[in-house]
Amino acid sequence: LQRTKIDDVTLERFIVGPLEVNCYLLTTEDSAILIDPGFAADELRKRVESLNHLESRMILLTHGHFDHTGFCPELVKNGWKAGIHPDDKLLLNRVPPDFEGLGYRDEPFESYVTFKEGWNFNIGGISLNLIHTPGHSPGSVCFIERKRRWAFTGDTLFADSIGRSDLPGGDEQTLMQSLEKLKGVLEPETLVLSGHGGCALFNTILRINPFLQD
């Protein structure tokens, strides 16, 4: 997936940063949502600049790891609002020493809103439901767009694998519980749009992902 449109909502994917994070941009005629902006590549930066005239511009973070949040300080300075689960606030843009050589910068920012389990975000015909899925990090979440059957799963669930649970704040048992939770809420034809790698329908993931086998 690079770009698709359903009804009046356009969905675009940008692969950004040395760790190749999937950043998703949802736009309508008068609004924009960025999910996990990562560290901006030139293509993403140009696209974002073209949206500065929109009245509603929101960043939604699936979790607080630096590779998913690095573009946030610049975006917030330019009028975007950012949202994150409160359990990941302390992670925001804090770069572990092992990754500093890749060009990541430690640039924490304080301007954000927080959201919790069951939160619903409605803007410009887009309706996203938040599911708290800790395990990769304490505040990891997924955003579900039920009308168009999109699920933005961050680093909780990939097409053929799952996120790491050995990072600070991660927990393997909690992650497995979160995966069971997703199995109970995602419809088979939902397109899973993860934080890294390719996209796949959930019914395909149930067949090929060894971590979701009963």
Which residues fall in each region the model found?
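Short Pro/Gly-enriched beta-strand edge/turn motifs at strand-loop
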Residues: K5-T10, F99-G103, G124-L128
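Conserved beta-strand segments of alpha/beta enzyme cores
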Residues: T10-E12, K81, V113, S127-N129, ...
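Conserved beta-strand hairpin/beta-sheet module of binuclear metal-dependent hydrolase folds
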Residues: Q2-L51, C142-G154
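Active-site HxH/HxHxD metal-binding segment of metal-dependent hydrolases
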Residues: F39-R45, E49-N122, P210-F211
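Short Gly/Pro-enriched turn/cap motifs at secondary-structure boundaries
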Residues: F14-V16, E110-V113, H132-P134
